[in-house]
């Protein structure tokens, strides 16, 4: 039997971002891995004008179907989505597409007919909280009902963690398979020093500057320790939420920590990010909520000591191997930081943990898992058809 033809729906990428976006990187990783697949030939669905950007994410010239997302069948995008009508259906048939994957379910423009075995990948459902906070309750109810109607049409969901799977089941009453992320590092790449912290001891946090990422607790923990440790706090993120960043900066000013805290919103290269990880005395991940949590694993793979908040998803994806703290307690975080800085894990412990995560979160493992999930669903449909 020949290969299946898989369409990776990248139409949720509608502009070239000013800074890296994790769900865009995720699509690039899938394209990189699927290129080597012996099961699938892959085509990307790409918005007009973004051909080169998608190629840069994938690292090669991807086979593409290029679309204008304003094109419709019924003159209504909403009706097209409701009826699963695709303006480029002839192109899908010409390429003999068997399976469609949408790597980011929230921004999905297209809902594909049943014959295309459409799979949605769910990273988290945090958008519901954001929407509820910023929208009048009646409008929120209407939007929620509309999304519920659309998502009932999707047969296959894939969650990036068991915790996301549970949340999807609770909120959408939809079960899903679990497929973990892979580590997006090129381990052959030489590190490039970040001059602003060369020769300085620092604690690192790599996250968006959004309040639920909980950098405030980390800042306040540093304040508790400022006379006991020499470290600065290096907060690496992006200015996607300016009000939240301004609030965090005001906390630093209030505590008179401006000389001890660095906010870095620049576009660091992968070589610079690797340097930041490997030269930190400690990476702290203080999040109150995550869909997966890449950064603790990235740091541990690079053999940096790591401390994580005790939320279930971080304990899940780190296999219960990392020390934890109560993310609502400044005192607990300060105590745990001081303990690890005083008694860091041994070189042997770090190497063992790095090897574990590097194998568990390999690109090959991710693509093998995705392949098994899709083949399982195709078999279930074929068996059901025969019956």
Give names to the regions the model predicted.
Residues 2-387:
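Carbohydrate transferase catalytic cores enriched for Leloir-type hexosyltransferases
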